[in-house]
């Protein structure tokens, strides 16, 4: 079976920045499962996987435009500190979901001032070209429920209390390994491992 739309694919991968810094990985023992062709991965990686088979190992370079896009200065904002009422101590590096007209957007605090906080809504890998080392671990047919929901369901029973067709990580689902709240495989703004 070859990687194609509507199939569930299990990937082991490492991703590095152009200068070789490892930013994320998912080993063979805990692969990333995703529904191919549903925007669950960044477009450059999903395109590169098309047609591959179980056991295929390959490297792929994904440019910023096919990953998380270019860095957008308009996504950096200075907001009043009282927006964060209920948070005891605001620190640089803290991440939050900001409610916007387009829905929740992950932001990171980049500066804390006397009465204001500077937040950045860019993905942590925006503007970066990425290098992936990938292994296709498994491929299977998706269930009707997975196709209807637009994402993979884990080994345990998966119930939904939402009415959107979200995808792994991008809308609050977890695929079983840690990305520090961001992740690197997620599709731009609408899914994948990453929140953004």
Curated annotation (Swiss-Prot):
Misc remark: The activity of SlyD is considerably smaller than the one found in other PPIases with the same substrate.
Protein name (record): FKBP-type peptidyl-prolyl cis-trans isomerase SlyD
Matches recorded under PANTHER family: FKBP-TYPE PEPTIDYL-PROLYL CIS-TRANS ISOMERASE SLYD
Free-text comment on this protein's domains from its UniProt entry: The N-terminal region consists of two globular folded domains that contain prolyl isomerase and chaperone activities.
Annotated EC: 5.2.1.8
Subcellular location field: Cytoplasm
Region IF-chaperone: start-end pairs: 76-120
Free-text disruption phenotype from the record: Cells undergo an apoptotic-like death upon DNA damage characterized by membrane depolarization.
GO biological process, one term: protein maturation
PROSITE patterns xref list: FKBP_PPIASE
Positions contributing to Ni(2+) binding: 167-168, 184-185, 193, 195
Oligomer and partners: Monomer. Binds to a broad range of unrelated Tat signal sequences. Interacts with the hydrogenase nickel incorporation protein HypB.
Main subcellular location of this protein, as a coarse class: cytoplasm
Region (PPIase first part), start-end ranges: 1-69
GO molecular function, one term: copper ion binding
Impact reported for residue 42 to S: Decrease in PPIase activity, but has little impact on chaperone activity and interaction with HypB. Almost complete loss of PPIase activity
Record text on activity regulation: PPIase activity is inhibited by binding of nickel ions to the C-terminal metal-binding region and/or the C-terminal part of the PPIase domain. Folding activity is inhibited by FK506 and by permanently unfolded proteins, irrespective of their proline content.
Function description: Folding helper with both chaperone and peptidyl-prolyl cis-trans isomerase (PPIase) activities. Chaperone activity prevents aggregation of unfolded or partially folded proteins and promotes their correct folding. PPIases catalyze the cis-trans isomerization of Xaa-Pro bonds of peptides, which accelerates slow steps of protein folding and thus shortens the lifetime of intermediates. Both strategies lower the concentration of intermediates and increase the productivity and yield of the folding reaction. Required for lysis of phiX174 infected cells by stabilizing the hydrophobic viral lysis protein E and allowing it to accumulate to the levels required to exert its lytic effect. May act by a chaperone-like mechanism.
Domain PPIase FKBP-type residues, every copy: 1-95
Organism field: Escherichia coli (strain K12)
Swiss-Prot/TrEMBL keywords: Chaperone, Cobalt, Copper, Cytoplasm, Isomerase, Metal-binding, Nickel, Rotamase, Zinc
């Amino acid at each position: 079976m070859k990687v194609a739309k509507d199939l569930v694919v299990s990937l082991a991968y490492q991703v590095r920045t152009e200068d070789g810094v490892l930013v994320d990985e998912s080993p063979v023992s805990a692969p990333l499962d995703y529904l191919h062709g549903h925007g669950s991965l960044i477009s450059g990686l999903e395109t590169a996987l098309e047609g591959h088979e179980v056991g295929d190992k390959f490297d792929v370079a994904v440019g910023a435009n096919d990953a998380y896009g270019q860095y957008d200065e308009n996504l950096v904002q200075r907001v009043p500190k009282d927006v964060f009422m209920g948070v005891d101590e605001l620190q640089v590096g803290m991440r939050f979901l900001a409610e916007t007209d387009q829905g929740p957007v992950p932001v990171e605090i980049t500066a804390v001032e006397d009465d204001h906080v500077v937040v950045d809504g860019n993905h942590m890998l925006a503007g970066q070209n990425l290098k992936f080392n990938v292994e296709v671990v498994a491929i299977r047919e998706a269930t009707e429920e997975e196709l209807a929901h637009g994402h993979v369901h884990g080994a345990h029973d998966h119930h939904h209390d939402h009415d959107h067709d979200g995808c792994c990580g991008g809308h609050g689902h977890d695929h079983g390994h840690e990305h520090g709240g961001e992740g690197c495989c997620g599709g731009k703004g609408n899914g994948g491992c990453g929140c953004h």
